[in-house]
């Protein structure tokens, strides 16, 4: 019997996940991430995943605002799927491209005869 390969597509049973309570979703994510860590190739990365998972969930255990909790669950799900897809256990860097304000001059007023714009 071959081992089931964990991918971004089969890591989460979305039908089951959508029916869970908020607490159970958090537990489901916690267990899923630890299962992912057990299957990770590199020992050092495996330990990093376990440590970060435990510390992050421990840090957020006292949250009470449902919106923030849902955001944290979604963040955990997203990071797990990113790790599976890119095969990297660390958060993918986000690049912020600076937005420059371009000040455009208004078009010249056709009624203005001064010629100065």
Swiss-Prot record:
PANTHER family in UniProt: LYR MOTIF-CONTAINING PROTEIN 1
Protein name, entry field: LYR motif-containing protein 1
Family per similarity comment: Belongs to the complex I LYR family.
InterPro entries per the UniProt record, alphabetical: Complex1_LYR_dom, Complex1_LYR_LYRM1, LYRM1
One of the Pfam families matching this protein, by short name: Complex1_LYR
């Amino acid at each position: 019997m071959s081992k089931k390969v964990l991918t971004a597509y089969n890591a989460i049973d979305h039908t089951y996940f959508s029916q869970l309570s908020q607490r159970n979703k958090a537990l489901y994510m916690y267990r899923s991430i630890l299962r992912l860590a057990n299957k990770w190739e590199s020992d050092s990365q495996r330990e990093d995943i376990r440590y970060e998972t435990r510390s992050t969930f421990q840090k957020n255990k006292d949250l009470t605002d449902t919106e923030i909790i849902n955001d944290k669950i979604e963040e955990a799900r997203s990071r797990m799927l990113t790790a599976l897809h890119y095969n990297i256990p660390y958060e993918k860097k986000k690049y912020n491209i600076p937005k420059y304000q371009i000040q455009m001059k208004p078009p010249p007023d056709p009624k203005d005869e001064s010629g100065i714009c």
